[in-house]
Design a protein with these regions (language model features):
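Envelope-exposed proteins and targeting segments
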Residues: 30-33, 90, 165, 196-199, ...
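Soluble, non-transmembrane domains of envelope/secretory-pathway proteins that act on or interact
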Residues: 256-257, 261-522
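Secondary-structure transition/capping motifs at alpha-helix termini
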Residues: 39, 54-55, 83-92, 156-158, ...
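Short loop/turn motifs at secondary-structure junctions and domain boundaries
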Residues: 22-29
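A penicillin-recognizing enzyme superfamily signal
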Residues: 3-22, 36, 47, 53-65, ...
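Conserved catalytic neighborhood of penicillin-recognizing serine enzymes
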Residues: 87-145, 164, 194, 206-237
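Active-site SXXK
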Residues: 9, 42, 67-96, 124, ...
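Mid-domain, small-residue-enriched loop/turn segments at the edges of structured enzyme/sensor domains
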Residues: 106-110, 141-183
Length: 522
């Protein structure tokens, strides 16, 4: 133990005001345990077994007692194993939506019970999303994840825990101690090297020189250096970024990474986090299970109060970063694949994002989730057969169909699915379907779609309404139908004796000659 750090931890834990004298609805006092480890050595530098003034020796030690870790186990049993095996990268995406039905109910549920749709592993860690953790675990496999957690990170999981729910969500058969959790997380801070936790280095005889007992550091490479770094990067975001669950542990002037944990009905609250100097795990709960009601995660709050004082005189420094083995990729935020024009034309805006990933896990194929579709800007829907060209734009939407679990189970990106657009314009009992604005086509003459207009002829004139085949010449006055006679109408005129046919030539023959001969008296 480090006497200075031990004294700091005890001072915070002896004062129940550190959690505002928190009690349960039935009046139970809150309990907590904390273990602080130096990642580079595995030395336990401080441990406190309960809150409140110490009333005796050999009291119950909540730091070494096993408790349910909740979601704080996910980095150890789902994300780190999958990253280390190359099964996923921080850029890999899964659908944040119930994975399947379990006993007739959509499973798993998130906390809160909302779903966002396609989400990256990085954001799944940051926001502690159950559906992403489960799918990540299933990607690497339950057996591989269990072996990674027990053999590489020293977790005392029961054989019954070799299942999706315990490893993916944290509902363990028995539980884990803060010592185990702190030692396992310390491997992230120690570039992937796990040190067995120890409470002493050596024991001296009364002469203060003779070594009676010595404890050697037992260590092993638990994961790749790149895995440890990428896990740290994601856990750092969980503490420092908006939407992260670990904001209650944050204090200024130090790099911090960590993960919260909560069990059903808020019976257990956990936080395990680390800096470049120390790693600490905190459990909070009641002796008899009761709901913990507190404005923030009380475990994260205690962690911050202790660790801020521990680091008060230490300079800030960055976490260890591998000298090689990492690369930055530009991908589609929804598919995690190489972005296409359709990704950049998404109706929400350009979906291209950058991720740091391990070399060899970067995507090599283009996004297959986004497709370009025609959208009517006036109807705000899929363009139909009657939508004019000037109202149509092309946008990128997600070509994906979700399982229907009822109206109460939705995802926030449902509006950006092609299947949702198609459903909106499908015929119903009360609607013919299609674009609500453009419901029929304009009527045009198929032989003259311009309606008589010749845009290429600047001298074109509209047709004469009395003779549509003859256009009106504006330079030629229209003839008076009355022939200019003030009496109006057609008046009889004497025919031309030299052309009795009136311009018809021999039309009429002898009939015309006889007619005019008889009437002229000749």
């Amino acid at each position: 133990l480090d006497p200075k750090i031990q004294e700091i931890a005890e001072s915070v834990y002896e004062d129940r005001g550190s959690l505002n004298n928190l009690t349960s609805a039935s009046g139970q006092l809150i309990h907590s345990g904390i273990t602080i480890i130096e990642p580079s050595t595995g030395n336990i530098v401080a441990m406190v077994g309960d809150m409140g003034p110490k009333s005796g020796n050999l009291l119950w030690n909540y730091a070494t007692d096993i408790q349910q870790p909740g979601s704080s186990i996910k980095p150890l049993t789902a994300y780190a194993p999958a990253l280390d095996a190359g099964a996923v990268s921080p850029a890999t995406t899964f659908d944040n939506y119930p994975v399947r039905l379990l006993n007739g109910n959509p499973w798993p549920k998130n906390s809160p019970n909302t779903y966002t749709g396609w989400t990256s592993v990085r954001n799944g860690v940051k926001a502690s999303i159950n559906t992403i953790a489960v799918q990540t675990l299933e990607k690497v496999g339950v057996t591989a994840a269990y072996q990674f957690a027990t053999e590489n990170l020293g977790l005392s999981l029961a054989p019954e825990d070799m299942n999706v729910s315990p490893l993916g969500l944290g509902g363990l058969t028995y539980g884990l101690s803060t010592v185990e959790m702190a030692a396992a997380y310390a491997a992230f801070a120690n570039s992937g090297v796990y040190n067995e936790p120890k409470t002493y280095v050596k024991v001296l005889a009364n002469d203060n020189s003779t070594v009676v007992l010595e404890k050697e550091t037992e260590q092993r490479v638990a994961m790749k250096e790149t895995t440890a770094y990428l896990m740290t990067d994601m856990l750092r975001r969980a503490v420092n970024e908006s939407g992260g669950t670990g904001g209650g542990a944050r204090f200024s002037g130090m790099h911090i990474a960590g993960k919260t944990g909560t069990t059903n009905d808020n019976y257990d609250r956990y936080f395990t986090g680390y800096t470049p100097y120390y790693c600490a795990a905190v459990w909070v709960g009641y002796k008899n299970n009761e709901r913990i009601s507190y404005s923030v995660n009380p475990a994260a709050s205690l962690w911050r109060q202790v660790m801020e004082k521990v680091h008060a005189d230490l300079p800030d420094k960055s976490f260890n970063r591998p000298s090689s083995g990492l690369t930055t990729v530009s991908v589609c935020a929804d598919s995690g694949m190489l972005a296409t024009d359709a990704c950049r034309a998404d109706s929400r805006g350009d979906r291209t994002v950058s991720y740091e990933v391990a070399v060899g896990t970067e995507p090599t194929t283009e996004c297959t989730l986004h497709k370009m579709v025609d959208i009517c800007t006036e109807g705000n829907c899929l363009a139909g057969e009657f939508c004019p060209a000037e109202s149509i734009v092309q946008k990128g939407y997600l070509d994906y169909v979700r399982e229907d679990y009822g109206e109460s189970i939705t995802a926030s990106d449902d509006a950006y699915l092609i299947s949702t657009l198609e459903k909106a314009v499908a015929p119903t009992e009360t609607s013919p379907g299609g674009c609500p604005v453009h419901t029929s086509a304009a009527v045009t003459d198929p032989d003259d779609p311009n309606g008589g207009l010749d845009p290429s002829d600047p001298n074109w004139q509209p047709p004469d309404p009395n003779d549509p085949d003859v256009p009106i010449d504006p330079d030629t006055p229209t003839e008076d139908p009355s022939g200019g006679d003030s009496g109006g109408g057609d008046q009889p005129t004497e025919p031309d004796p030299n052309d009795p046919s009136g311009g018809f030539g021999d039309a009429g023959g002898d009939w015309w000659s006889g007619f005019w001969g008889d009437n002229t008296g000749t």
